[in-house]
Amino acid sequence: EIEPIDNSYNVIMTQGKVEFGDIIDGKNLDRLVSALGIDNDDLIKEAPVQIVSTGHSKVMIGIKDYKQLHNLRPDMKELNKLSDIINCNGYFVFTFDSKEKDILLKGRMFAPAIGIEEDPVTGNANGPVGAYIVKYNLVKIENDNLNFSAKQGMSIDREGTINVNVHIENSEPVKVQVSGTATVVF
């Protein structure tokens, strides 16, 4: 869906079926945190590292601290090797440590296995993280929808905001939509 707004557009994308894949643990988790340059203690303990998909699977990795998120310098070769082992090509590292009242989380998405060292803003990561937040009750949800905004791209000077709407039935995420403002630049 595309809605014109002034000199730009609001683009809304309904994502595919929500699917929860493997939890990454043991040696693969150790390899992952090492490749990211973090420790297991940096992870949000209530948020298991897990593959989640709404069309394109990503590994969800919740960490406690924004400064650490901002300063990540992943070992892309190691992430690439790990992608072959776990059958997932993207890693979405996020934190709820946001000083901005309208921004629930900030994230970074790495996918070196498909030639993307860092994606500045991606619905293919923020959509699944919305479903993941619902599944693990990581934030308070008061009705049948979770609506939030997330930021990405700050660490590579290509900042953008994405809006996420998760429809919930029987406490489970059933439909995810992402939206944001797009501007034609050519």
Q: What are the residue ranges of the model-derived segments?
A:
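Acidic, low-complexity central loop/insert segments
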Residues: 1-81, 134-186
